[in-house]
Amino acid sequence: MGENMTFNVHLKAVIGALTGLIFGSQLAYGQGPEDRMVYFGETHLHTVLSFDAYIFGNRNGPDEAYRYAKGEAISHPAGFEMKLDRPLDFQAVTDHAIYLGMLPAMHDPKMEASKHPISLELRKAKTPSDRLLGFQKIFALLQPGVEDDLLDMEIVKSTWSNIIESAHKHYEPGKFTTFIAYEYTSGPENQNLHRNVFFRGDKAPEVPFSRMVSSNPEDLWDWMDENRAAGMDSLAIPHNSNGSNGQMFKTETFNGQPFDAAYVTQRIRNEPIVEVTQVKGDSETHPILSPNDEWADFETMPYRIGSWDPSNVQGSYVREAYLNGLMLEKEGIENPFKFGLIGASDTHVGAGAFTEGNYWSKVGVIDANGKLRGSVPLDKPREDGSLYSDNNFQTWSASGLAAIWAEENTREALFDAMRRKETYATTGPRIKLRFFASADYDASMINSPDLSKQAYAKGVTMGSDLMLKDGQVPKFILWAIRDPYSSTLQRLQVVKGWVDASGKAKETVYDVACAGGVGVDLKTNRCPENNATVDLKTCKSSAPTGENELKVMWEDPSYNADEKAFYYVRVLENPTCRWSTWDAIRAGVAPRKDIASTIQERAYSSPIWIN
């Protein structure tokens, strides 16, 4: 074993021991909140049972997906091996409810569906272009008002039953958690309004609610409420607001009506968290919305889902939604946008690609290598002279993961944590992150061996409201530990949003802890540059400073008790190579100049709202 490998193994052992001490140990459900552990997992994944995944060559089913999450190797549709560097703690299979299980049936000569003309065409599809054409023909059947003589609800019902059975088979309480789950795929005019629906327990309705019933998410919530009344609790997680064309977080109902209290209550009850990062880009914010945030232009995917149509920025990003929620409160309307954050992959090959250096993208044989996904030049230019494939796969990301603080690794504990929004998102690395707030914290706590216990006892954690009395000022505790398999930490940041006395929404970003032990410049609220660099010929990183742990107690220097505000944490790693640069290096070509060569992996906490 070489010196670097020895160091890395030692580092992982040290960080593992440190993590156990400061982030709690696995104890029985029902003990104090300070005993909660952070669990990392996948909340958005497709198998052979999703119509698009099947068309794109995926033949991995739920069983294979769960085995992958537990650390086993499975095969990519292009034939190579996919394997995690370490197992996940939990996973949900979220196949599309629409046309659930239909594509395997259409390819089975024993099934009546195989005799349909579209089935015959799909069986002949071999090339990526053939498969995309087949996808378009199926997708055309999914539009409102289109007569569909192919869909067989008995197939949907039996497939759903098999998904539930697989989730039960792979559930190992305390070790590995599965959820009964699926994806609801509303998308009028390619405006993404998709949600993943999770059930708390071991029972679910006979058939999942799909866009074939309604494209209005409010009808989905009604269905969820009905099931909850019948003893089947669930929650929905919206995703890819960045591709919603402003529809996900618009400040009116689906049908254009003003919000009322009943709408807000129902939305929050059914959608407590939002997926902020995944393969189809990042939805935290956008440089148009946050021009003074130097890190806002991160993994920006500018299109509506499945098209080249631009997605309207307003109404499509979570930070703006948080601000709009405060604006609604200012107007006397309840806030429908008090949601927490989570990350996921949205893989369509049954296995999430969470690391830049081992990225296999999303849609099977359609984007299985650098040439297909636009990171490596084609063998010869296209007719228009372009050197790269005619798609927007180069805007996709090696992201993300869900992180949940829970008492134990069970369905009930993880679900309840999602319900209370004690969750955060990462773009892939397993960064451990805590965030607390209180008016009663004192400086001596920060180095206390029972910091977590005191922080919970005296305050609130991510996803919560902090209610203050007159004259009180909030103090915040931020605490991050690096993933030993990833880069070191560069900085801890607080993102603040508020509405001022004139009714104008405002935001700012504070650096609050810096690598190298240096202080924040109080004039700019920024850490000094640590001059971290990446060699684009080898992807070797060089950082004069970088931390395994960053921890700080912080007070807002501009706090105004008359202004409602939200705060959330963003932690940034030192720069590393983006997946597209890794593709180029392995192909022996220069990285593409019109896309980022490096990225800064990050984590986003759920906010704390100050009232």
What are these regions (language model features)?
Residues 3-15:
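Bacterial N-terminal signal peptides that target proteins for export
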Residues 115-146:
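Aromatic- and acidic-residue-enriched carbohydrate-binding clefts of CAZyme catalytic domains
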Residues 208-209:
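Long, hydrophobic alpha-helical transmembrane bundles and adjoining juxtamembrane helices/loops
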